Amino acid sequence: SFDELPSIIERLQKSQISQPTKLALEFLILSACRTTEVLNAHWSEIDLNKELWIIPAERMKSSRRHEVPLTKRMVEILEEAKNIKLDNNLIFPSPLNGRPLSNNTLRLALQKRLKVPATVHGMRAAFKDWAAETTNFANEVSEMALGHAISNKVEAAYRRGNLMAKRRQMMEEWMQFLSGHDAKIVRLQIKKVTL
């Protein structure tokens, strides 16, 4: 369940797991992205000025470009990853061969090293549950954060924006939750009263 994630993150950060694996797994949890999206992330996809990770359409399951807002902790992870940068463009290269880390590497880190009885993909489900159960964000905000295609054809035809401001706020709250500093941000709806 998502309640356990702050302690999992803390254990991950203190673990003796290799630095690329540790950083990739935390980045995956913070971004709520798919394993292959994170493991194949390239430096050329990062725009620190706009605080965005721009995943090209050809790497997305939905075949649509996906923009992921970078939180403060995600930027810190990227700074740490620069120290292990090899001659290629990968953010999280395998220290053994410079190629992307394998899906199995993250699975073993989570299940064997951290003793978490969950899949890496289950981290995305935990994000979705957290968003649904503890926030007031509309369902489509978390769906867009997960990079899901809009299944309703009419809505898809009219949806032009990517809800970036709301997604950025959601991901900041997710980061706060994961860090154990769950700053509950209360959103008030003020009704205009005329006398």
Locate each region found by the language model.
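Hydrophobic, well-ordered secondary-structure elements that form the walls
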Residues: 70, 128-131, 142, 174
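Active-site/catalytic core of tyrosine-dependent DNA strand-transfer enzymes
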Residues: 1-6, 50, 69-121, 126-127, ...
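Short alpha-helical segment immediately N-terminal to, or the first helix within
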Residues: 27-28, 130-134, 145
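Short, polar N-cap/turn motifs at the start of nucleic acid-interacting alpha helices
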Residues: 45-52, 116-117, 136-159, 180-186, ...
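C-terminal secondary-structure termini that scaffold catalytic or DNA-interacting sites
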Residues: 2, 72-88, 93-98, 150-153, ...
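Short, contiguous acidic/charged loop-to-helix segments that flank catalytic cores in large enzymes
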Residues: 12-16, 57-67, 93-99, 114-120, ...
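Basic, Lys/Arg- and aromatic-enriched nucleic-acid-binding interface segment
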Residues: 1-41, 49, 60-64, 84-85, ...
